[in-house]
């Protein structure tokens, strides 16, 4: 089948490309919408080849219509696309999708109300009548409607869906696609093939019994004999396939007027499946929020998946989409969505938020944050709030303050910065000028040892007469005695070092 690019050709393709997606919009239908619709039909296990004719589009529309109440946004878009394609096949002039939907509703109502005189002509006119000839009810060579059982391939597809999806919301559209035109016996066969999930099957049986009882209350049995050539009226249990045979089911579905027992039973099953989906999907739409690192596309997928399971009217679901989709997004996407405005489409939202959460977006946010931090720091320092330790720097080249020698603009001084001679640096300078050592004392000393060595001086005795004692003289005498003993001890511990004379000059202890 390929991409189904040959669905429309010539004038029909030109008519297709003139139809707007929405009233008052600028975008029109293109070839890519047909390709997308064909892929979606394959995903729902439908035949994309039905898109080539108006009858096939009508069959697909009847198949998808019951699932619109609980369907996602993608399912509604698929239905709208098929409605426009149906109008193009029938040469119905429409300007946008809304007009196509209105034309489709009018045509369906007209088909339901118009009489079918060809059905009364008998089996000879059966091929030209409006009797359903959908699978599994097919017409044999004699013109009679016979039943053809469901293929094992269809049953296998249904069982595989239930095992993989476990009654997720997408199970309902798949059931509608696989059970198109099926009889109650075929539907019971599909339900009986589900091996697990017996609790869900029991819930489904309870819903079917309730709907059957409601049918019996609304359709009482007419008293009296049944006219010749007619079949009895079906009861609720007959529609469920428990008290009716396959021949009776086929007769009801092909009678004039027909009683679509298969479609009625299918609606009951869909109601039960909706109840099961709510049980298997306990998350509320209010709890679906976008994570800080989650992409907007994944968030939208989770949102619509949960929205499909919500049992609410379409108006309420539209309100949830317009309000909660933006409200529960993360701050980055929320700012972008609010800037788009309330009338933005889902395509515009996903395009605008496409890069949010990726490496490029994270790098851009980090760069903006660093720029703001640097701006705040510079403003903070300019206002005088930065109180650091300010040191006055001095240039060794020119001797001025305020800059370093490597930034000095004056001519470079050659040689030692202290004496001006070449051949050595200032740290190795041996000029006669005295300089302070690392202890802060002037070095070298004029005489004697350096200040970091203990030095002893000759104590001179006073020549004045002794001072009279006034009570505190004894304390001073005691302190003086202790000082003398300490000096004697130091002299015994540190004898004079005469060997240092060659390094430090004359020894003051020998003078």
Swiss-Prot record:
Name the PROSITE patterns for this protein: ZF_CCHC
Site annotation Cleavage: residues: 135-136, 366-367, 380-381, 437-438, 453-454
Q: Tell me which residue ranges form CCHC-type zinc fingers.
A: 393-410, 414-431
Could you confirm whether the keyword Zinc appears in this record? yes
The entry's comment on post-translational modification says: Capsid protein p24 is phosphorylated. Specific enzymatic cleavages by the viral protease yield mature proteins. The polyprotein is cleaved during and after budding, this process is termed maturation.
List the record's Gene Ontology CC terms alphabetically. Answer: host cell cytoplasm; host cell nucleus; host cell plasma membrane; membrane; viral nucleocapsid
Matching entries from PANTHER family are given as: ENDOGENOUS RETROVIRUS GROUP K MEMBER 24 GAG POLYPROTEIN-RELATED, IGE-BINDING PROTEIN
Motif Nuclear export signal covers 16-22
Which ranges belong to the motif Nuclear localization signal? Answer: 26-32
| Covalent lipid sites (N-myristoyl glycine) | 2
Q: Where is the composition biased (Basic and acidic residues)?
A: 107-116, 473-490
Q: Which SUPFAM superfamilies match?
A: Retroviral matrix proteins (SSF47836), Retrovirus capsid dimerization domain-like (SSF47353), Retrovirus capsid protein, N-terminal core domain (SSF47943), Retrovirus zinc finger-like domains (SSF57756)
Family of the protein in this entry? Belongs to the primate lentivirus group gag polyprotein family.
Protein name per Swiss-Prot or TrEMBL: Gag polyprotein
Comp. bias (Low complexity): 118-128
Superkingdom classification of source: Viruses
Record GO terms (molecular function): RNA binding; structural molecule activity; zinc ion binding
- In chain numbering, motif LYPX(n)L motif lies across 493-503
> Where in this protein would one find the motif PTAP/PSAP motif, according to its record?
462-465
